[in-house]
Amino acid sequence: MKRRFGRREFCIKSKSATFAVVYMADNTTKTTITPLEAAFIREHSGEDASKLLFRYSKESMEGFDVAFCVLQIESRNRLRAKLPCFAACEEFVFPPSINSSQTSGELSAQYKSSLLKGGETMVDLTCGLGVDAFFFAQKASRVCCCEKQDWLCKIAESNFKALKVDNCEFVSAACEDYLAQMEPCEVIYIDPSRRDENLARVYAVEDCSPNVVELQEQLLCKAPRVIIKLSPMSDLKSLCRDLQKVSDIHVVSVENECKEVLVELKRDYIGQLTFHAVNITKTNTDILSFNQETDETACEFVSSKEQIGRFIYEPNASLMKIGRFGRLVEKYDFKKLHPHSHLFTSDVPIEHFCGRSFEVEEIRKPNAKALKDIKKANIVVRNFPQSVKELRQQTKIKEGGEDYLFFTTLCGEEKVCLLCKRI
């Protein structure tokens, strides 16, 4: 259904209350929230946005814009978990269209700010909503925020005033144009758009806009250090091939879900590339670092089920993406089930493992007859010919519960099902 308020049109999917907000030709939008609007937003916080819009669509609301307020309520409902500091600020204005999939969450933005030494001068060439710039500003001495959309730049500047950030300046310009004429700084940060001209997702670094492969020399001329944020789907081998002077690649996961890949370029860097597997939780940040030469040579494999230890370990999403598991074996001294299974085992429990840990209760054959007594379990497939969906159809096991079933293949090509409990 559609509802019009002045020059704006809201398209609402009533089931999910998700907005696709289309601004008319003038592309004007509000940059501040009035006290009356703040009171309305506070009063209706957490309510269903589509119902609110329907309820107030026919009422004359003096002193504030109902559609704007509903947009703010919907944005806060949707992004409160990802951006708690911003959602909690009553004066913070969420723009009418925000690519929440590309916008950094606060936890990953805090990690990026930790990469700064402190006191640097910095330019964020793709400011957007300003999440990363906000956290960079807490470490850098000065941050220049460049945003090509003038209306979004004005919103970000107003929001930073509301957040009481006073060491940022804002420039409305295409990042390529600003890069050409900007003064040198110590660090440049860039998060190229991962949408093409038809708004379809792209993942290859050369398909993003701007194309940092083409800009990398110019970037390093303006700053000795460049940090590039890319898709979690980025191919790491391609990045190493297409980008020069790469010193570090950070694969960043939040709660074991891969969120982004950060590539660091350094102007005068000569040496081995270092990978950082990062998994951030609300209480802890696990980081395992290793150089490009680390490989599988140190791995010992399990050839039969009798060699499976009491415990099974599944590396976190960042480690799984990087894929160099020799460093894990070196650190934890355990065996791998198969070169392609990416599961590890030991007889001794490992504290603070960078991933999930399980205790093996039984080893069974991977068929319906051997599993007929199990009614509910979490099924995990690693290097196994059948999918989770196929196994559920075959075994009639429902999703959930405390049990985990790992369907996998050992180094001797024996297929097994490991009945485990998470520890």
Report residues per predicted region.
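SAM-dependent transferase fold signal centered on methyltransferase-like domains
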Residues: K2-I423
